[in-house]
Amino acid sequence: METLDKIKKQISENPILIYMKGSPKFPSCGFSARAVEALMHCKVPFGYVDILQHPDIRAELPAYANWPTFPQLWVDGELVGGCDIILEMFQQGELQTLLADVAAKYPQE
């Protein structure tokens, strides 16, 4: 599978998805750690891709997303943004509402 197809598949199969360095339990950079902490406070299920384990995705996603840095939060197929945007939305209560609405649209089996 081509890298771009893999990215599109990941985004379509995960209503809430973060591309990050490391994992939610063991983030490998401060930006990823802060972003995933905000997501975890929202108490909704989310997927993640560790870009350190997937150099092809790390190389191609910035061009596809037109967003140069990581982490990247994708919600319902749309790029929300990186760490600063995630934290700003969380502090304003917008992230919690967005994620709760999307999680309700896609109940876990």
From Swiss-Prot:
Cellular component GO terms held in the UniProt record: cytoplasm
Main location (coarse class): cytoplasm
Xref: CDD domains: GRX_PICOT_like (cd03028)
Occurrences of domain Glutaredoxin (ranges): 4-106
Pfam families: Glutaredoxin
An example Gene Ontology molecular-function term: metal ion binding
Keyword annotations from UniProtKB, A to Z: 2Fe-2S, Cytoplasm, Iron, Iron-sulfur, Metal-binding, Redox-active center
Residues holding [2Fe-2S] cluster: 29
Keyword Zinc appears in the UniProt entry: no
InterPro entries named among the record's database cross-references: Glutaredoxin (IPR002109), GRX_PICOT-like (IPR033658), Monothiol_GRX (IPR014434), Monothiol_GRX-rel (IPR004480), Thioredoxin-like_sf (IPR036249)
Chain positions recorded as glutathione binding sites: 21, 58, 70, 83-84
Localization (cell): Cytoplasm
PROSITE patterns assigned: GLUTAREDOXIN_2
UniProt-listed Gene3D superfamilies: Glutaredoxin
Transmembrane in keyword set: no
Quaternary context: Homodimer.
Cited function: Monothiol glutaredoxin involved in the biogenesis of iron-sulfur clusters.
PANTHER family named in the record: GLUTAREDOXIN FAMILY MEMBER, MONOTHIOL GLUTAREDOXIN-S14, CHLOROPLASTIC
Similarity comment text for this entry: Belongs to the glutaredoxin family. Monothiol subfamily.
Name recorded for this polypeptide: Glutaredoxin 4
Organism: Pasteurella multocida (strain Pm70)
